Amino acid sequence: MKKTLDANQLKLIAIFAMTVDHIAWLLFPGYAKGALPVVMHIIGRLTCPIMCYFIAEGYYHTRNIHKYTFRLFLFAVISHFAYSFASNNFVDARSFIPFYFGGILNQTSVMWPLAWGLVMLRVANSERFTQLQKTLLVILICLVSFPSDWSCIASLCVLAFGTNRGDLKAQGRWMLFFVALYAVVYFFALDKLYGVLQLAVALSLPLLARYNGQRGKNARVNKFLKWFFYLYYPLHLTILGAIRYFG
Protein backbone atom coordinates (compact mmCIF):
# COMPACT_ATOMS: atom_id res chain seq x y z
CA MET A 1 0.00 0.00 0.00
CA LYS A 2 1.36 3.41 -1.00
CA LYS A 3 2.24 5.81 1.82
CA THR A 4 0.33 8.82 0.54
CA LEU A 5 -0.92 10.55 3.71
CA ASP A 6 1.09 12.75 6.06
CA ALA A 7 0.23 13.51 9.69
CA ASN A 8 -1.56 16.76 8.91
CA GLN A 9 -3.81 15.09 6.34
CA LEU A 10 -4.71 12.25 8.69
CA LYS A 11 -5.47 14.68 11.51
CA LEU A 12 -7.70 16.73 9.19
CA ILE A 13 -9.57 13.54 8.32
CA ALA A 14 -9.93 12.89 12.05
CA ILE A 15 -11.39 16.31 12.87
CA PHE A 16 -13.74 16.13 9.88
CA ALA A 17 -15.01 12.75 11.10
CA MET A 18 -15.27 14.08 14.65
CA THR A 19 -17.30 17.08 13.50
CA VAL A 20 -19.68 14.84 11.56
CA ASP A 21 -20.09 12.67 14.66
CA HIS A 22 -20.76 15.61 16.97
CA ILE A 23 -23.23 17.19 14.56
CA ALA A 24 -25.08 13.87 14.59
CA TRP A 25 -25.35 14.05 18.39
CA LEU A 26 -26.72 17.59 18.05
CA LEU A 27 -29.26 16.82 15.32
CA PHE A 28 -30.23 13.36 16.56
CA PRO A 29 -30.01 13.33 20.39
CA GLY A 30 -29.85 9.99 22.12
CA TYR A 31 -29.21 6.72 20.35
CA ALA A 32 -31.08 7.43 17.12
CA LYS A 33 -31.54 4.36 14.93
CA GLY A 34 -32.06 6.05 11.58
CA ALA A 35 -29.67 5.38 8.70
CA LEU A 36 -28.29 8.94 8.58
CA PRO A 37 -27.28 9.29 12.26
CA VAL A 38 -25.85 5.77 12.31
CA VAL A 39 -23.73 6.45 9.21
CA MET A 40 -22.58 9.77 10.70
CA HIS A 41 -21.53 8.02 13.90
CA ILE A 42 -19.72 5.31 11.93
CA ILE A 43 -17.74 8.06 10.20
CA GLY A 44 -17.00 9.48 13.65
CA ARG A 45 -15.33 6.22 14.73
CA LEU A 46 -12.35 7.18 12.55
CA THR A 47 -11.36 9.91 14.96
CA CYS A 48 -10.29 8.31 18.23
CA PRO A 49 -7.82 5.78 16.75
CA ILE A 50 -6.13 8.48 14.68
CA MET A 51 -5.90 10.77 17.72
CA CYS A 52 -4.46 7.97 19.85
CA TYR A 53 -1.98 7.06 17.12
CA PHE A 54 -0.62 10.59 16.89
CA ILE A 55 -0.45 11.10 20.64
CA ALA A 56 1.87 8.09 20.62
CA GLU A 57 3.79 9.44 17.62
CA GLY A 58 4.13 12.75 19.42
CA TYR A 59 5.85 10.94 22.29
CA TYR A 60 8.63 9.87 19.92
CA HIS A 61 8.86 13.13 17.98
CA THR A 62 8.49 15.83 20.65
CA ARG A 63 11.50 17.91 21.60
CA ASN A 64 10.27 18.32 25.17
CA ILE A 65 8.14 15.55 26.65
CA HIS A 66 7.34 17.61 29.75
CA LYS A 67 5.94 20.52 27.73
CA TYR A 68 4.04 18.08 25.52
CA THR A 69 2.47 16.42 28.55
CA PHE A 70 1.59 19.78 30.13
CA ARG A 71 0.03 20.98 26.88
CA LEU A 72 -2.21 17.92 26.64
CA PHE A 73 -3.42 18.29 30.22
CA LEU A 74 -3.97 22.03 29.76
CA PHE A 75 -6.22 21.41 26.78
CA ALA A 76 -7.90 18.56 28.64
CA VAL A 77 -8.95 21.07 31.31
CA ILE A 78 -10.06 23.64 28.73
CA SER A 79 -11.91 21.00 26.74
CA HIS A 80 -13.76 19.76 29.83
CA PHE A 81 -15.83 22.95 29.93
CA ALA A 82 -16.51 22.88 26.19
CA TYR A 83 -17.46 19.20 26.34
CA SER A 84 -19.82 19.70 29.27
CA PHE A 85 -21.44 22.71 27.60
CA ALA A 86 -21.96 20.80 24.35
CA SER A 87 -23.50 17.82 26.12
CA ASN A 88 -27.20 17.16 25.67
CA ASN A 89 -27.30 16.82 29.46
CA PHE A 90 -26.06 20.37 30.11
CA VAL A 91 -28.32 22.26 32.53
CA ASP A 92 -26.34 25.11 34.06
CA ALA A 93 -22.94 25.84 35.61
CA ARG A 94 -23.35 22.82 37.90
CA SER A 95 -22.97 20.63 34.82
CA PHE A 96 -19.29 21.54 34.72
CA ILE A 97 -18.77 19.65 38.00
CA PRO A 98 -18.03 15.97 37.32
CA PHE A 99 -20.44 13.51 38.98
CA TYR A 100 -22.68 16.34 40.27
CA PHE A 101 -25.82 14.89 38.69
CA GLY A 102 -24.83 11.28 39.27
CA GLY A 103 -23.55 8.81 36.73
CA ILE A 104 -19.99 7.68 36.21
CA LEU A 105 -19.43 7.66 32.44
CA ASN A 106 -18.74 10.57 30.05
CA GLN A 107 -17.95 13.06 32.82
CA THR A 108 -15.28 14.82 30.77
CA SER A 109 -13.84 14.90 27.27
CA VAL A 110 -11.64 12.44 25.41
CA MET A 111 -8.70 14.81 25.91
CA TRP A 112 -8.48 13.57 29.51
CA PRO A 113 -7.75 9.90 28.69
CA LEU A 114 -5.55 10.96 25.76
CA ALA A 115 -3.36 13.00 28.11
CA TRP A 116 -3.21 10.11 30.56
CA GLY A 117 -2.42 7.79 27.66
CA LEU A 118 0.76 9.78 27.09
CA VAL A 119 1.62 9.39 30.78
CA MET A 120 0.90 5.67 30.50
CA LEU A 121 3.31 5.41 27.56
CA ARG A 122 5.96 7.31 29.49
CA VAL A 123 5.54 4.91 32.41
CA ALA A 124 5.78 1.87 30.14
CA ASN A 125 9.04 3.10 28.60
CA SER A 126 10.56 4.36 31.84
CA GLU A 127 13.56 2.64 33.42
CA ARG A 128 12.69 4.09 36.84
CA PHE A 129 9.95 1.57 37.58
CA THR A 130 9.86 -2.17 38.03
CA GLN A 131 7.42 -4.20 35.95
CA LEU A 132 5.11 -4.53 38.96
CA GLN A 133 5.18 -0.78 39.54
CA LYS A 134 4.42 -0.16 35.86
CA THR A 135 1.45 -2.53 36.00
CA LEU A 136 0.06 -0.86 39.11
CA LEU A 137 0.51 2.61 37.61
CA VAL A 138 -1.26 1.55 34.40
CA ILE A 139 -4.17 0.24 36.48
CA LEU A 140 -4.26 3.50 38.46
CA ILE A 141 -4.31 5.54 35.25
CA CYS A 142 -7.16 3.39 33.96
CA LEU A 143 -9.16 4.22 37.08
CA VAL A 144 -8.42 7.95 36.81
CA SER A 145 -9.34 8.12 33.11
CA PHE A 146 -12.33 5.74 33.31
CA PRO A 147 -15.13 8.33 33.81
CA SER A 148 -14.37 10.18 30.54
CA ASP A 149 -15.48 10.01 26.93
CA TRP A 150 -13.88 6.84 25.50
CA SER A 151 -12.98 5.95 29.09
CA CYS A 152 -9.58 4.38 29.80
CA ILE A 153 -9.78 2.69 26.39
CA ALA A 154 -8.31 5.80 24.76
CA SER A 155 -5.38 5.69 27.20
CA LEU A 156 -4.80 2.00 26.53
CA CYS A 157 -4.92 2.59 22.76
CA VAL A 158 -2.23 5.26 23.07
CA LEU A 159 -0.17 2.70 24.98
CA ALA A 160 -0.82 0.04 22.33
CA PHE A 161 0.15 2.31 19.45
CA GLY A 162 3.26 3.53 21.27
CA THR A 163 4.63 0.20 22.49
CA ASN A 164 4.03 -1.48 19.12
CA ARG A 165 5.35 1.38 17.02
CA GLY A 166 6.33 0.27 13.53
CA ASP A 167 4.08 -2.80 13.60
CA LEU A 168 0.65 -1.70 12.38
CA LYS A 169 -0.77 -5.22 12.56
CA ALA A 170 0.07 -5.51 16.26
CA GLN A 171 -1.13 -1.96 16.86
CA GLY A 172 -4.40 -2.77 15.12
CA ARG A 173 -4.93 -6.02 17.02
CA TRP A 174 -4.44 -4.38 20.41
CA MET A 175 -6.54 -1.36 19.48
CA LEU A 176 -9.41 -3.59 18.33
CA PHE A 177 -9.09 -5.71 21.48
CA PHE A 178 -9.40 -2.70 23.76
CA VAL A 179 -12.24 -1.16 21.75
CA ALA A 180 -14.04 -4.52 21.78
CA LEU A 181 -14.02 -4.35 25.58
CA TYR A 182 -15.47 -0.84 25.34
CA ALA A 183 -18.08 -2.07 22.85
CA VAL A 184 -19.20 -4.83 25.22
CA VAL A 185 -19.70 -2.36 28.07
CA TYR A 186 -21.50 0.03 25.70
CA PHE A 187 -23.66 -2.84 24.43
CA PHE A 188 -24.91 -3.88 27.87
CA ALA A 189 -24.82 -0.55 29.73
CA LEU A 190 -25.94 1.99 27.12
CA ASP A 191 -27.21 0.78 23.75
CA LYS A 192 -26.79 -2.45 21.78
CA LEU A 193 -26.55 -0.94 18.28
CA TYR A 194 -24.17 1.77 19.37
CA GLY A 195 -22.08 -0.81 21.18
CA VAL A 196 -21.56 -2.74 17.95
CA LEU A 197 -21.01 0.54 16.11
CA GLN A 198 -17.85 1.22 18.16
CA LEU A 199 -16.11 -1.56 16.22
CA ALA A 200 -16.13 0.72 13.16
CA VAL A 201 -12.80 2.01 14.51
CA ALA A 202 -11.36 -0.74 12.29
CA LEU A 203 -12.01 1.57 9.33
CA SER A 204 -9.17 3.79 10.55
CA LEU A 205 -6.52 1.12 9.98
CA PRO A 206 -6.37 1.40 6.15
CA LEU A 207 -5.88 5.15 6.60
CA LEU A 208 -3.10 4.69 9.16
CA ALA A 209 -1.48 2.17 6.81
CA ARG A 210 -1.03 5.03 4.33
CA TYR A 211 0.86 7.22 6.81
CA ASN A 212 4.19 8.21 5.28
CA GLY A 213 5.87 9.22 8.54
CA GLN A 214 5.99 12.89 7.58
CA ARG A 215 4.36 15.76 9.44
CA GLY A 216 3.70 17.89 6.37
CA LYS A 217 5.51 19.62 3.53
CA ASN A 218 5.37 23.25 4.67
CA ALA A 219 6.91 24.37 7.99
CA ARG A 220 4.59 27.38 8.36
CA VAL A 221 1.53 25.28 7.64
CA ASN A 222 2.77 22.69 10.12
CA LYS A 223 3.08 25.31 12.86
CA PHE A 224 -0.37 26.73 12.13
CA LEU A 225 -2.00 23.30 12.06
CA LYS A 226 -0.30 22.28 15.31
CA TRP A 227 -2.29 24.88 17.20
CA PHE A 228 -5.36 24.53 15.00
CA PHE A 229 -5.65 20.88 15.98
CA TYR A 230 -5.46 21.77 19.68
CA LEU A 231 -7.91 24.67 19.49
CA TYR A 232 -10.45 23.17 17.10
CA TYR A 233 -11.71 20.58 19.58
CA PRO A 234 -12.87 22.95 22.36
CA LEU A 235 -13.93 25.66 19.90
CA HIS A 236 -16.20 23.49 17.79
CA LEU A 237 -17.75 21.96 20.92
CA THR A 238 -18.44 25.45 22.28
CA ILE A 239 -20.14 26.43 19.02
CA LEU A 240 -22.25 23.26 18.95
CA GLY A 241 -23.13 23.79 22.60
CA ALA A 242 -24.23 27.36 21.91
CA ILE A 243 -26.41 26.19 19.02
CA ARG A 244 -28.03 23.56 21.21
CA TYR A 245 -28.44 25.78 24.28
CA PHE A 246 -29.58 29.00 22.62
CA GLY A 247 -31.14 27.55 19.46
Language model: regions and residue ranges:
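Alpha-helical transmembrane segments and their immediate juxtamembrane cytosolic regions
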Residues: 1-247
